[in-house]
Amino acid sequence: LNFDDAFQAIEKKATALNCGYKETNFRLRDWGVSRQRYWGAPIPILSDGEENFHAKDLPVELPSKVEFKGVSSPLKDMPEFLKVDQEGKALIRETDTFDTFFESSWYYARFASFDSHDSMLDDRANYWLPVDQYIGGIEHAVLHLLYSRFFFRCMRDMGLVEGDEPFTNLLCQGMVLKDGAKMSKSKGNTIDPQGLIEKYGADTVRLFVLFAAPPEQSLEWSDQGVQGAHRFINRIWKLVNKHIHAGLSEDFDVNHSNKDLKLMRSKIHKTLFKVKDDYLRRHSFNTAIAAVMELSNDIPQEWFDSSASPEMRKVANEAIESILLMLNPITPHLCQHLWWQLYPQESIIDKSWPKIEESLLIDDKLKIAIQVNGKLRSEIEIDKETEDDSVKSMALNNEKIIKHLAC
C-alpha cells in the first residue's frame, strides 16, 4: 500500500473495531487586530450593554470630519456616530475598526478596478489576476498572506473573481542588517543612504544592495561594499570610453571569425542568457551582476586599442553593448549616459534585450571526468565531435591515470 491507501485502511479498520475514527484538525489562527486607525474597516456590531446585534444599515460609513483629542479613538467622542436607534432600541456602535491587514488582504484586486462604484471589483480584476509576482517580508507568512488567500476564496465564492489563488509566485526578501542586527531607531543602528547617494550616486548604492546578497537573504550593510561597487562602475566607465576613443568598426561576417572571436561571442551570449534568466525567473540579481563582472574581465584589453583588427573591435562593441543593456535595470543613469556616448541619437530605454544566438550557447568543448575504482583521478577537455576510441586513448594515456593503473 502507498501512504494514502494505508492511511485509509487504518482509518477503516479503527472505525470497524470502534477504537478510533478520522477527524480533521484545522490549524486556525486568531486574526491579529493590532494596527488600527479610526478610518479602518468598521465592525458592523451594535450593543445595548448586555447583548450584541448586527447593524442592519450596511455599509457602515465612517464620518469624514473628526477631532483628535487624545490617544483613544475619536469615534468614541462622536455621539452622532456612536449612538444608534434600531427598531426602538438605543444601541451603541462598535468603535473598534479592523486593522491594516483587513484592507491589504484584497487591495491588489481593488487596484485592478479602482474606480468601480457599483461593486468591490469588476471584470478588470479577472483580466489582471492572479498577481504574477508578489514580494513581501517573511513576517507576513502566517498573517497577511494567509488572510489574502482567505479573502480571495471568499471573493471567488461571491463570484467576484475567478481562480483559487491570489498570487502565482512569492518572494520573501531578506532584511538589511547593521552590525548583525535588524535596523532600529531605538538601537540607533539605522543607516541613511542619502549621504552615500550624494557621494557615489544612486546607481552605485543600488548596485551594492543588489550585489551584496541574494534577495531572499539578509544583507549586512557595509560602506566598504559601496566603495567596491563604485570601483566597478568606474571600470565600466573607463572601458566604454576607451572603446569609443578607439573608434567603432564596421560589420563583419561572424561565420568567418576565428576561434578566439567565436569563444568571446559564445561567452557574451551565454552571459545574456544567464542574466535574463536571473532577472526574470530566479530574481537572483547578485549572480546576474557577478556574471556581467566576469564578462567585463574576460574581454581582452588589446581589443579596445585602435590597432586591434576590425573583427576584434566589432566583437568588443558587441560585448560593450551587451554589458550596458544587462546593467541598465540596475544602473540606469550610468548606462544611459554611456549609451548616448556610443549612439548620440538613441536612448537605451528604447532598446530591446539582445537576441540570443542559440548556436553560441552550445560548447564546442566538453570536460570529461576520469575515475579509477570509483574515485575521480583526472579530467580532460575534448572537442564535442571526438570519437569514443580517441577519448578512451586520451584517458588511458593521461599521466595521472597511468599512475593509478600501474598500481
Predicted features along the sequence, with ranges:
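NTP/phosphate- and nucleic-acid-binding module
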Residues: 1-38, 116-117, 368-407
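Acidic, turn-prone loop/beta-hairpin segments
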Residues: 45-56, 60, 170, 176-177, ...
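Glycine- and acidic
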Residues: 13-17, 123-139, 190-194, 212-223, ...
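Conserved phosphate-binding loops in nucleotide/dinucleotide-binding enzymes
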Residues: 1, 92-98, 134-137, 177-203, ...
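Flexible, glycine/threonine-enriched loop-and-boundary segments that flank and lead into catalytic domains
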Residues: 31, 61-98, 102, 111, ...
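Active-site-adjacent "gating/activation" loops or surface patches in catalytic cores
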Residues: 96-134
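Residue patterns forming the tRNA-binding/recognition surfaces of aminoacyl-tRNA synthetases
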Residues: 1-55, 66, 187, 192-225, ...
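Core structural elements
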Residues: 31-40, 231-239, 261-277, 281-302
